[in-house]
């Protein structure tokens, strides 16, 4: 498993609103502004909002950061076809009533989004202590599929099992869903944890993630978007790119860059540093995904 990306597979550019990446195997003309087709579309990924977290040393605006992100999404000049939240909607709590209160608080905030199609998946903070019971009460299934303009989306739950596994039953479901697709189908996978072993000692891995990757490998056009690690990170497993997103409550340090994983303290000189969301412009015919990172704005 290599950590680098060849130029043909991964190109970093500077773009309006943040850093733009081109993810995919198609020609790089998209990055230079090639005209899109009628089937191209745009969606937004937000992650790790951690409603219920309340340490002002880490984020003094813990009650307002998600609201700022919602306002920024609403102000985008092109509204997305849909929005995806990739887990840790709430911050962990042992109290089942408090867990539901936090999930309700999250839902109340995101109800202000202009876009009507908003999808959700759990993180371990939402689901690991009750196998996803509370999450399902508010948002429905923890794993599912949907299709949009020729792209097949697969949402994998690797958090409801407290061992950090997908589990045999869900892997069988995944195999069945993939069998319905042609080998050159456009496939986008959403997970919370990384499917590969990024930093297992920090819980940045999925115990049986290699089995999911093995099922995906025969398909030519697959990309994975995930959260959990609270930072942008890009890695290839074979021909499959995996893209981690910024969080919206606090950043975390680079993988294994210090003895223990802990939130990065708030920097008053650079408020909201490394907090943000991303837009993904899907170029369907050539299976490219142009990723724009949007930092949270003060005010």
Language-model features: locations:
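N-terminal active-site segment of His-dependent metallophosphoesterases
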Residues: 13, 30-100, 183, 198
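Extended active-site neighborhood of metal-dependent phosphoesterases/phosphodiesterases
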Residues: 35, 95-186, 208-223, 235-287
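Active-site neighborhood of phospho(di)ester-bond hydrolases with catalytic His/Asp-centered motifs
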Residues: 46-47, 83-87, 118-124, 190-191, ...
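Solvent-exposed loop/turn segments at secondary-structure junctions
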Residues: 49-52, 89-92, 124-128, 159-162, ...
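Short acidic, glycine-rich surface-loop motifs adjacent to enzyme active sites
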Residues: 182-198
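A contiguous binding-surface segment within folded domains or other stable secondary-structure elements
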Residues: 199-211
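C-terminal/domain-terminus segments
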Residues: 291-299
């Amino acid at each position: 498993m290599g950590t680098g990306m060849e130029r043909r597979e991964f190109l970093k550019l500077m773009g309006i609103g943040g850093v733009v990446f081109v993810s995919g195997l198609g020609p790089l003309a998209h990055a230079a502004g090639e005209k899109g087709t009628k089937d191209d579309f745009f969606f937004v990924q937000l992650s790790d909002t951690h409603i219920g977290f309340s340490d002002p040393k880490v984020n003094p605006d813990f009650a307002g950061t998600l609201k700022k992100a919602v306002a920024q999404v609403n102000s985008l000049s092109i509204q997305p076809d849909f929005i995806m939240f990739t887990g840790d909607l709430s911050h962990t709590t042992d109290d089942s009533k408090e867990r539901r209160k936090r999930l309700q608080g999250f839902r109340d905030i995101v109800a202000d989004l202009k876009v009507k199609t908003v999808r959700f998946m759990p993180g371990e903070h939402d689901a690991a202590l009750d196998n996803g019971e509370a999450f399902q009460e508010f948002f429905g299934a923890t794993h599912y599929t949907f299709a949009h303009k020729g792209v097949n989306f697969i949402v994998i739950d690797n958090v409801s099992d407290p061992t950090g596994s997908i589990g045999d039953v869900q892997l069988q479901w995944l195999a069945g869903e993939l069998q319905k697709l042609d080998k050159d189908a456009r496939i986008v996978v959403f997970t919370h944890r990384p499917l590969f072993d990024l930093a297992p000692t920090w819980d940045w891995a999925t115990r049986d993630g290699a089995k999911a990757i093995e099922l995906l490998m025969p398909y030519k056009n697959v990309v994975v978007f995930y959260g959990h690690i609270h930072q942008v990170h890009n890695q290839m497993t074979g021909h499959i790119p995996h893209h981690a997103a910024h969080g919206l409550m606090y950043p975390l340090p680079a993988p294994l860059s210090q003895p223990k994983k802990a939130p990065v303290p708030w920097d008053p000189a650079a408020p909201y540093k490394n907090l943000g969301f991303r837009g993904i412009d899907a170029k369907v015919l050539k299976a490219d995904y142009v990723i724009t990172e949007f930092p949270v704005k003060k005010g």
